[in-house]
Design a protein with these regions (language model features):
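Alpha-helical transmembrane segments of multi-pass membrane proteins
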Residues: 114-127, 153-169, 336-349, 373-394, ...
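Hydrophobic alpha-helical transmembrane segments of multi-pass integral membrane proteins
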Residues: 80-88, 111-144, 328-368, 372-373, ...
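Juxtamembrane helix-boundary/capping and inter-helix hinge elements in multi-pass membrane proteins
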Residues: 58-61, 72-76, 153-157, 182-195, ...
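Short helix-coil transition sites and intra-membrane helix breaks within transmembrane domains
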Residues: 38, 78, 90-100, 115, ...
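Juxtamembrane and boundary regions of transmembrane helices in multi-pass small-molecule transporters
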Residues: 34, 165-167, 172-232, 239, ...
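Membrane-interfacial loop-to-helix junctions in multi-pass transporters
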Residues: 73-79, 104-122, 149-159, 233-239, ...
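Core transmembrane alpha-helical segments of multi-pass membrane transporters/permeases
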Residues: 40-44, 64-100, 114-117, 285-321, ...
């Protein structure tokens, strides 16, 4: 079976298997630029590109079986359930009246709304560093702060960018993050050394990002929270803020994301009923938080199902292996070797849909390059992880972006044309990681070499 998987042929030579994915990204950008974006259009694009793969595949008779293998990826079930359960949590929070309560609290505190993006960034930094998960951090914070931003006339794209940036910070730096662990293991480096040497890059990007969030926050918000006239009748719903806190604690204690979300959803239902925020009749209604939360994520679920089938095209055709071999042939000097590591991490993330798989898949390539030129193994781990995480935060089909878009589309007055293009310009920390590591590679700043052990 493995041999058949590797021998699936596509018209177009080595570029053939990549054409559906490249076409999807191109069409998504065009759709957004022409104001015909949104998740509904993205699903149509994904379907069209999956069909393109069918016409490019030489073995059309078995194309369905080939692509359906992508749905056996163990990550898929976790991702889909996380979206659905996060959708329920978002609706439980929204329908409880917590947004009005938060606006009331902001009004009473006299807080300038321009600081909300910075607050979102810092909160997500703390959560993701504590839990080591970007998706979980976005799922915990976005359902609360995105609707709040929309209600206070803070740019929603800016708020999503702040949330994603904070989530990527911890995913890249936290010692318990899967990407941190994977990058250290694949590069044969000590985890403590990796975190220690990685911190200056992450900290520099975070400081610059924080300044940008303050500047853009002040520029793109009215700062008029104090002018709102609310009576605080929904203040009791502020008790539900215990849910994102509980998420952080549970994930920090080692609970997986699905178990954590189920627990928080159930507790959210109980709290809403006990506090009287949502009556039982509405809770059981078709427009209630449970049904609305699940159904609101269905477009996202459909897109991910199509996406994983498209990713399987790259696996079945051997496109990943060909890319691996091609990258190795490009290395001539330490600088070019590190540039190839940069390229492998970024292309790998785009091709696999996330940083975790890319690091595991291309880790051996990066380690082979760093060994060849005697580059410090921590240096390889930091380039691999920093670039992969930064790229994932920018990807239109990356988990952090998709969760954020799902929350935005669930807003009461959501802009049907809102898309990833409204968010990408403001994911400052993601851009920062990519720029800082690229400059480090080009200038040689931070490049260290392995100490040669004396011959006995």
């Amino acid at each position: 079976m493995e041999q058949n998987k590797q021998n699936v042929g596509f018209y177009g030579g080595t570029l053939g298997p990549w054409l559906p994915m490249l076409a999807m990204i191109t069409l998504m950008i065009i759709s957004t630029a022409t104001h015909t974006g949104g998740l509904n259009r993205v699903v149509l694009i994904a379907f069209a590109c999956l069909a393109l793969g069918f016409f490019l595949c030489k073995d059309k008779k078995h194309y369905g079986g080939i692509t359906l293998k992508g749905l056996t990826n163990p990550m898929l079930g976790t991702i889909l359930m996380a979206y659905i359960l996060a959708g329920v949590l978002a609706q439980l929070m929204r329908q409880s009246g917590i947004i009005s309560a938060l606006i009331w609290a902001v009004t009473k505190a006299g807080l300038n709304t321009g600081f909300l993006p910075l607050i979102a960034f810092v909160v997500c930094m703390l959560i993701s560093t504590s839990c080591g998960t970007s998706t979980g951090s976005v799922a915990a914070v976005a359902p609360v702060l995105v609707p709040l931003a929309a209600s206070l006339n803070v740019d929603v794209g800016l708020m999503c960018g702040a949330i994603i940036s904070g989530a990527i910070f911890g995913d890249n730096l936290a010692p318990i993050s899967d990407t941190t662990i994977s990058s250290a293991l694949t590069q044969e480096a000590e985890l403590g050394d990796v975190v220690r040497t990685r911190f200056p890059y992450a900290a520099l990007s975070a400081v610059v990002s924080a300044g940008l969030f303050v500047w853009f926050g002040m520029k793109m918000s009215t700062g008029a929270a104090g002018a709102l006239n609310l009576d605080g009748s929904t203040a009791k719903s502020l008790v539900l803020l215990v849910l994102p806190v509980l998420m952080v604690i549970m994930m920090r204690k080692g609970w997986d994301l699905i178990a954590t979300l189920i627990t928080c959803d159930v507790l959210g239902i109980v709290l809403n009923l006990v506090l009287g925020c949502i009556p039982l009749s509405k809770m059981l209604d078709g427009k209630g938080p449970v049904v609305a939360g699940m159904s609101g994520m269905m477009i996202l679920v459909l897109y991910v199902l199509l996406l994983f089938q498209m990713l399987e095209i790259l696996n079945a055709s051997g496109a990943f292996e060909n890319l691996n071999a091609g990258l190795l042939n490009m290395c001539k000097t330490p600088r070019s070797g590190e540039l190839v590591c940069f390229l492998a991490a970024s292309l790998g993330s785009f091709a696999t849909g996330g940083s975790g798989i890319a690091i595991l898949f291309f880790g051996s390539v990066v380690r082979s390059i760093t060994k060849t030129f005697g580059i410090d193994r921590c240096r390889g781990a930091n380039i691999l992880d920093g670039v992969a995480c930064g790229t994932t935060g920018l990807m239109p089909y990356g988990n952090p972006m998709l969760v954020s878009l799902g929350v935005v589309m669930a807003l009461e007055k959501a802009d049907p044309n809102f898309s990833f293009m409204n968010v990408i310009p403001y994911t400052f920390h993601c851009w920062g990681l990519l720029i800082i590591f690229l400059l480090s590679i080009l200038t040689g700043i931070g490049r260290r070499y392995e100490e040669k052990k004396p011959v006995a």
